[in-house]
Amino acid sequence: MHAKMKAMEFTDKLNLQPVIRPVPEPQAGEILIQVSAVGVMPTEKVWSTTSHYADGTARTKAIPGHEFSGIVAGLGAGVTGYSLGDAVFGFNDWYAEGATAEFCITKPSNLSPKPSSLSHIEAASVPISLLTAWQGLHVQAKLQKGERVLIHGGAGAVGLFAVQLARSRGAYVIATSSKANIDFVKQLGADEVIDYREGRFEEAGKVDVIFATVAGETLDRSWDLLKPNGRLVAIAAELESSTDPRVKSAYFIVEQDGEQLASLGKLFDSGELKAFVKAELPMEEADRAYSGSIAGNHGKLIIRTTTR
């Protein structure tokens, strides 16, 4: 008889319900993870990957949560580089089952050793947000030392890493945030922080790069701030279906990359990067986590999947 595990799955009404499922078995080239913590992205409720498989057929009962931290609990044939008991963190394929469960399956290329300076709770807040910030600033926008960059949403789960990475690159960092988070974003390394409710970010002047974690009017007002040869990168999920040619060229979706994650993970142990958790909840309260009603000023919401 297969071992069983607790998990949370989406219902037809996109609420989350607790279920008991068999512990998955790693196939060749796969790793079984005993999950300790998982990051929450409330918009996952409406992602196409929640309701459809890669071939377009309808999908039900998906397990959410694609960034996680945990322990290697099983190795499929041919897997090298990891051993049972290794502490890891990673970012699963979008169409794979998520990690809001006691165990999940992933590929070695999606994983990295967990930074020793981070707890599992902290580490679970990192993979998607940090890789989004890194790939957006350095792969898509190719941010250079001395350039001026405007980061919309500097206190958000992605924005707080974008500010730290841009500062580390040697850019002049301008960020927007709520009034309550201005001091926090300055401590991350921003040179200027603008209250998005009361201030006008246009007054900061022309910039080389804009990193937009938001859409709507804020994005519409941003284009005119770009210098000649300026670059805008947009990550807001609602932009995926945009027909605006400018938006289509600016929008990108982060990709799994264990090597990038391993390289960036060293920056936590050196003190160059810091992770921030907005709140943590037990797995039984996952539906509340995905409701978007959990208060907190900055960082990512985390679900604990074990009691350890």
PLM features: residue spans?
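C-terminal hydrophobic helical "lid"/dimerization subdomain
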Residues: 2-3, 261-308
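NAD(P)H dinucleotide-binding glycine-rich loop of Rossmann-like/cofactor-binding domains
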Residues: 81, 91-153
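Mid-domain Rossmann-like dinucleotide-binding core that forms the NAD(H)/NADP(H) cofactor-binding site
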Residues: 84, 126-195
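Short, polar loop motifs at secondary-structure junctions
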Residues: 177-181, 197-199, 234-241
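Short acidic-hydrophobic, aromatic-tinged amphipathic segments that line or gate anion-handling sites
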Residues: 192-197, 281-284
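A short acidic, Gly/Pro-enriched loop at the edge of an enzyme's catalytic core
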Residues: 202-209
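Glycine-rich phosphate-binding loop and adjacent beta-alpha segment
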Residues: 214-276, 305-308
